Design a protein with these regions (language model features):
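Acidic catalytic/metal-coordinating carboxylates
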Residues: 39-42, 65-68
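Short hydrophobic/Thr-rich beta-strand motif most characteristic of the beta2 strand and flanking loop
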Residues: 31-38, 46, 106
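Active-site beta3 strand of CheY-like receiver
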Residues: 50-56
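C-terminal output helix
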Residues: 110-119
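The feature encodes the CheY-like receiver
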Residues: 62, 90
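Two-component/phosphorelay signaling modules centered on CheY-like receiver
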Residues: 16-35
């Protein structure tokens, strides 16, 4: 299966610089349709209006965290591939994310190679 580089990707983070970093890395990997949301609530609004092929979200955001966003998405029946990004790599976090239905997990800081390996694991080769 070939990954569709025209799929819509939603990057969710409350830090503008992080969304720009992830956007740049995704573009360097050939993805073209990248959108951003500043928090879980605005991400859910965007997802109500459009179908996304992938969501990459920071864990630690206010008022709705990335894990709360993931739970809300899964509760709605949406199985969109979801990658959580976090600076806190604890066994508890990994287990909580897996229980919530996460597809991939990335530790900060990360680079294009790390992102690509996670994307391949979640989406398949490209």
């Amino acid at each position: 299966v070939t990954v569709d580089k025209d799929m819509h990707i939603l990057v969710v983070d409350d830090f503008y610089t992080m969304t720009q970093l992830v956007r740049g890395l995704l573009k360097s990997l050939g993805f073209r349709n990248i959108e951003e949301a500043r928090d879980g609530g605005s991400a859910l609004q965007k997802m109500a209006e459009k179908s996304y092929g992938l969501v990459i979200s920071d864990w630690n955001m206010k008022p709705m965290s990335g894990i709360e966003l993931l739970r809300a998405i899964r509760a709605s029946g949406d199985n969109v591939p979801f990658i959580l990004v976090t600076a806190e790599n604890t066994v508890e976090n990994v287990l909580e994310a897996k229980a919530a239905g996460v597809n991939g997990y990335i530790m900060k800081p990360f680079n294009a190679g790390t992102l690509k390996s996670r994307l391949v694991a979640v989406l398949g080769d490209f």
